[in-house]
Amino acid sequence: LDSIIHLTDEQFYQLCMANKDVNLELNAEGELIIVPPVGGESGRNEADLIIKVGNWNYQTKLGIVFSSSTIFRLPNGAKRSPDVAWIKLEKWQALTEEEREKFPPLTPDFVIEL
């Protein structure tokens, strides 16, 4: 079946901003995905991993760490938010201010998905 609605990057961004209490993603085919909340154990494990990657990054100062609240615009058109993401500092610095403020148009260098 064909999708009824095709969202531009800006329309998807506005949809997410208007519905901040709902975690949304788009797959490469443009299908909207509602991401359910996680339970206590999964949330605790996710937080543990963010702390560990964050501590490593704090020591090395090689990049930027992101939580599952950050959506990345991937080259295949998908808009995804991994549980933990890390990006090399030079990739982050190459983005414009607007790209940093909205959904960064890049693939993280490292992700963890629980």
What residue spans do the PLM features occupy?
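Gly/Pro/Ser/Thr-rich low-complexity, intrinsically disordered segments predominantly at protein N-termini
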Residues: 1-114
